[in-house]
From Swiss-Prot:
Pfam families, per the entry: SSF
Job of this protein: Transports acetate.
Gene designation per UniProt: actP
Residues annotated as signal peptide: none
Protein name: Cation/acetate symporter ActP
Length: 549
């Protein structure tokens, strides 16, 4: 079926970075009833799960962490579902479609952070924390200041990520389903609030698991059909792609995406350490019963995601062959209908027809819902658990804390809908880049050093953490994306698109310097408490286990 799509889907480098954002204007398309029916089936099924989960959510632990009863395998699938976004699917396959081999290099950037989580973070995080990563950071440091900093870092990351998701959701749904942009944004916001409000982490987990299974199935089918077309020969796949691509053999050469070593290093560090500082990802490690299951979670998640990113590479090259060389998918000017981000969607039509096109469109929508639900729960827990129950009203009952959490979900949902509408025609791709930079420059150094460095003090954590956060924001504003492309200045004050190399360095140096020079009695006491923390982090003695329902 030839769909008359006339959209500009310009992808900045970070737009493929889990942004789900289609930048630029889109023209509303004819209603795609196959996609809508399949999506409605998904919604009805997941709302049924939410109803089931709501009957099992009886306590704070149930709401935040599903009672710690999720298995390692289930959590691995849920983590993959939380992390693999629609733009990982559409954006990276589009990068391969346009740039060839460079798309694979970019996709690997999302994986390199997971060994760090596996070997350095997962086990100790589970043994030291209960509901949020601030539990870990404040284990032996001053509760108030550390939780405020951690919550601010979490909320900024969640807000930026959420806006990008909502705008991307509206654009994507307008493009794929033919629905009005504002209706699409409201629909995503309302469903997101329902999942989190009534089902908590249990419903969110199962939405993410179902979405991961659907996405892996859809991508596997597309890759299988592509490989079947070339006789299951990678040599034939690459040869045919090079034969029809305008760049020819150059699509097999690396180095076209990032222009200089500093940018390459900064991008790599942002992806690697940013992943290890995303609050909605870290929160998932508290849903399992113990450190062993936390390690298994990362093992399974890395396997699922690695497999998925390999599939996007095959899908991208398949799109070069079956979509790029087919005039049916081109507009009058010879450009891909809907822009390059639609390469995977057109490929779905090419290998599976209308029905499979509807399925992939519905999966893209389901993907967005799974990601925003995880983000909303992470933001709500930062407010209710870190700020309300441990800073502003110490000793609050579980019921009071849960009430604040649910009010926060409603507020976050309404804000996300409003901002999604306000940012409709804005370039929001930079927001995800900024979210990763802040996660890498504020959250990650605090988590890592609080678990591993015995000389860390509250003073060092506060000053270094705020320095990292502020540096990331300022350098991003002064860089080419915001300063030149959005604000319209001639030349960027900070020449690199990615601030992570500099902001991470500032954070670690700041934390080290201000901790090392802290000679206060409070600092000495905090250093002495490290031994007890170390024993707990290694043994899990005293950790809250999962409960049977």
């Amino acid at each position: 079926m030839k769909r008359v799509l006339t959209a500009l889907a310009a992808t900045l480098p970070f737009a493929a970075n889990a942004a789900d954002a289609i930048s630029g204007a889109v023209e509303r398309q004819p209603t795609n009833w196959q996609a809508i029916i399949m999506f409605l089936i998904f919604v009805v099924f997941t709302l049924g799960i939410t109803y089931w989960a709501s009957k099992r959510v009886r306590s704070r632990s149930d709401y935040y962490t599903a009672g710690g009863n999720i298995t390692g395998f289930q959590n691995g699938l849920a983590i993959a579902g939380d992390y693999m976004s629609a733009a990982s699917f559409l954006g990276i396959s589009a990068l391969v479609f346009t740039s060839g081999y460079d798309g694979l290099i970019y996709s690997l950037g999302f994986l390199v952070g997971w060994p760090i989580i596996l070997f350095l973070i997962a086990e100790r995080l589970r043994n030291l924390g209960r509901y949020t990563f601030a539990d870990v950071a404040s284990y032996r440091l001053k509760q108030g200041p550390i939780r405020i900093l951690s919550a601010c870092g979490s909320l900024v990351v969640v807000a930026l990520y959420l806006i990008a998701q909502m705008v991307g959701a509206g654009k994507l749904i307008e493009l794929l389903f033919g629905l009005n942009y504002h209706i699409a944004v409201v629909l995503v916001g309302v469903l997101m609030m329902m999942y989190v409000l009534f089902g908590g982490m249990l419903a969110t987990t199962w939405v993410q698991i179902i979405k991961a299974v659907l996405l892996l199935f859809g991508a596997s089918f597309m890759a299988f059909m592509v490989m079947k077309h070339v006789g299951f020969s990678f040599n034939n796949l690459f040869s045919e792609a090079m034969a029809v691509h305008p760049k020819g053999v150059d699509i097999m050469k690396p180095g076209g995406l990032v222009k200089d070593p500093i940018s390459a290093l900064s991008l790599g560090l942002g992806l690697m350490f940013g992943t290890a500082g995303l609050p909605h990802i870290l929160m998932r490690f508290f849903t399992v019963s113990d450190a062993r299951e936390a390690r298994k979670s990362v093992f399974y998640a890395t396997g699922f995601m690695g497999y998925f990113y390999i599939l996007t590479f095959i899908i991208g090259f398949g799109a070069i062959m079956l979509v790029g060389a087919n005039p049916e998918y081109k507009d009058a000017a010879g450009h891909l209908i809907g822009g390059n981000n639609m390469a995977a969607v057109h490929l779905a039509n090419a290998v599976g027809g209308n029905l499979f096109l509807g399925f992939i469109s519905a999966v893209a929508f389901a993907t967005i819902l799974a990601v925003v639900a995880g983000l909303t729960l992470a933001g709500a827990s930062a407010v209710s658990h870190d700020l309300y129950a441990n800073v502003f009203k110490k000793g609050a009952t579980e019921r009071e804390e849960l009430r604040v959490s649910k009010i926060t979900v409603l507020i976050l949902g309404v804000i996300a809908i409003i901002l999604g509408m306000l940012f409709e025609n804005q370039n929001i791709a930079f927001m995800v880049g900024l979210a990763f930079a802040i996660a890498a420059s504020c959250n990650f150094p605090i988590i890592l050093l609080s678990m591993y460095w015995s000389k860390l003090t509250t003073r060092g954590t506060m000053l270094g953490g705020w320095l990292g956060l502020i540096t990331a924001v300022v350098l991003m504003i002064l860089g080419p994306t915001i300063w030149v492309q959005i604000l319209g200045h001639e030349k960027a004050i900070f020449p690199y698109e990615y601030p992570a190399l500099f902001s991470i360095s500032v954070a670690f140096l700041g934390i080290w310097f201000f901790s090392a020079t802290d000679n206060s009695a409070e600092g000495a006491r905090e250093r002495e408490l490290f031994r007890a923390q170390f024993i707990r982090s290694q043994t899990g003695f005293g950790v809250e286990q999962g409960r049977a329902h």
